[in-house]
Amino acid sequence: MGIDVAGLPVIDVHCHPFLDRGELTADDFTRLTAFGGVDDDWLPAGGVELTDAVRDELRRFRRDTAYHKRMVADLAAFFGVEPDLDAVLERRNAAVGAGYSDYVRRLFGDAGITGAVVDFGYPQPAIEIKPIRAQIPTEIVPIYRIEPLIVELLASDIGWDEFRRRFDDTIANALTNRGYRGVKSIIAYRTGLDISPLSRTPDQGYLALDAIRRGLGGGSMKKLRDHLVCRSLELCMEHSVPMQI
């Protein structure tokens, strides 16, 4: 016997902050919705000149991605128009112009979304929590991603004691004073989830950072990240908040 879950409220537990971008062109909308559709900035960095022909090919590629096609189809159904980009964009821009927060409220209502666990670690520079809460009419639960902090600390000319202190203090401040209600790591995307319980020892953090500073390699970056994930879990336990991995 099947169970109909269509009417159940939904909490989105993996999302990122977004603000009102106002009216969008077709190319703007395509870039925003073609997840995995290649960023223009990547090509020159790889030695590919952004000619008109390359831009046209990119546009076709992006509009053929599953995410873009699904977004156009879903918004077409929402607005009651044909699944055509121009028709959808015309109605979307009109809805945003009439009131962005009301438009988002209607979208969330249609999807049954009643709350969002929001990872503020992307995009960078980080968006503040307050404007998101002002524009997005649902419960926002912010979580603090540790990877931007790790990048910042690695760029600082500091030893292990100061590194560890700043890491702990920044996370504690985020949880006690800045409105964050959990911590997140994307270590699975970085060095993987094969983390030994022994990684929690401070000696591993010290030795790993020292090896990184001296350019010794030997898996030192993984060892440092493994230790900091373990330390983050300890901080979450101290503050009685969850950690998302």
Where are these regions (language model features)?
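Metal-cofactor-binding active-site regions of metalloenzymes
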Residues: 2-236
